[in-house]
């Protein structure tokens, strides 16, 4: 594969394939979230090491070819996608849009609107794949890559060894760039301004997600020696905890820039007073739809049935979350850990206790 060893500028995307993968991933998380209807056993072989590339909806011709050539990578594409969705759900857990899609919605519905939510979806899943592939390389699970080949950082102390097995972030970035962007290269529609607008937006946000992982990667060091001494000091490159990536992208979601696309396919800020976006900013071209009500056309679930916080003035409060429809208070029984005790050695053992609590549910 060409171009997997250096950082390049962004080019096209993949979201239909990712959303297809979600159908198996998210049936394990919550049945109503992002379900597309393809069974896991049809996507992966019995051992989770073989992917049936011809069974996957949404792949372009080049993506299908890459899927066959790099078949062992696809399991980690799914794992990264799953990680991205779970982080998306956590980041938006108290919002009207909580990274959910109606179970009967097709995967292209979430991308029918070029909103801030679509921007975040592209970025977080793209970043998830980069981290998943980078760590799979380090673990020796992929034949095409291994430990990071990054050069020794200039600021590293002379008595520290550079050579521990680090996450192969450069290969992971290159593979994600090549695979994710293949769909846009295959399905170009230069005369359709709407398609060009979405393509330019998605290209940018995918790169923002990838670069979020690349730029947050850091040097990690460890001491080795007899009886706790630090006679040997070893350092390596490590990708960050994914929550760090989620937090960064959530902030960029809040600060996302509204764009317009010129007849030449170039993105420009919609308002002249706005700054030009950097390659790590999120951008969008459409206003967000109404997430208060069910919208089958766009696969929006609405907020009816969502739990709200009675005393909160934020979006998770009953006043905002329920969109003025009011709420119902119910006494429900929950199971919580209790009577926890430290056991030698070394874990905490808890009992499971039932407790009745009040919950407020949007009408």
From Swiss-Prot:
Palmitoleoylation is required for efficient binding to frizzled receptors. Depalmitoleoylation leads to Wnt signaling pathway inhibition. A lipid is attached at residue 227 (O-palmitoleoyl serine). GO terms for biological process: canonical Wnt signaling pathway; cell fate commitment; neuron differentiation. Residues 1-27 form the signal peptide. GO terms for cellular component: extracellular space. It is found in: Secreted, Extracellular space, Extracellular matrix. Pfam families: wnt. Ligand for members of the frizzled family of seven transmembrane receptors. Probable developmental protein. May be a signaling molecule which affects the development of discrete regions of tissues. Is likely to signal over only few cell diameters. This is Protein Wnt-5. It comes from Halocynthia roretzi (Sea squirt).
